[in-house]
Amino acid sequence: MNYQPIVIIGAPRSGTNMLRDVLCQFQKVGTWPCDEINYIWRHGNVGSETDEFSVDMARPKVKEFIRKEFDNFASDNDLNFLVEKTCANSLRIPFVDQVIPEAKYIFIVRDGVDVVGSAAIRWKAKLDLSYIVKKIRYVPLL
């Protein structure tokens, strides 16, 4: 691995996007051009009813697929640091650590009342098709 994975852990609407965007202002630091890569993380576990994954769900083929996605993205974009901030990872930190043990973690905490207020505004917002199109590019084919 010729790059350092950085995983931001935080609840939705807690500032993970803002932190990721600030970090990605530095040279050779980047991230996927979509908000989250939950479908990449769910590869091989699509049938799971929740985003909470145990360590034993990080089977060899699952780890290989996810690591390859990280490696390819970092290589294709000539990155020294690859920042990832899928909020669902807050429910599966041991799984993430099993897949990418060399990752460095940044934990972000925001007052729950503020998170709820921000989430309510987001939930009531109009559907953003350009946002959805960006995410679709990183949904693995079954």
Pin down the residues of each PLM region.
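PAPS-dependent sulfotransferase catalytic core
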Residues: 1-76, 126-129, 133-140
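Short coil/turn segments at beta-strand junctions that form active-site/ligand-binding loops
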Residues: 3-4, 78-80, 102-104
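Short beta-strand segments
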Residues: 8-10, 33, 82-85, 107-109
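PAPS-dependent sulfotransferase catalytic domain
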Residues: 44-46, 87-142
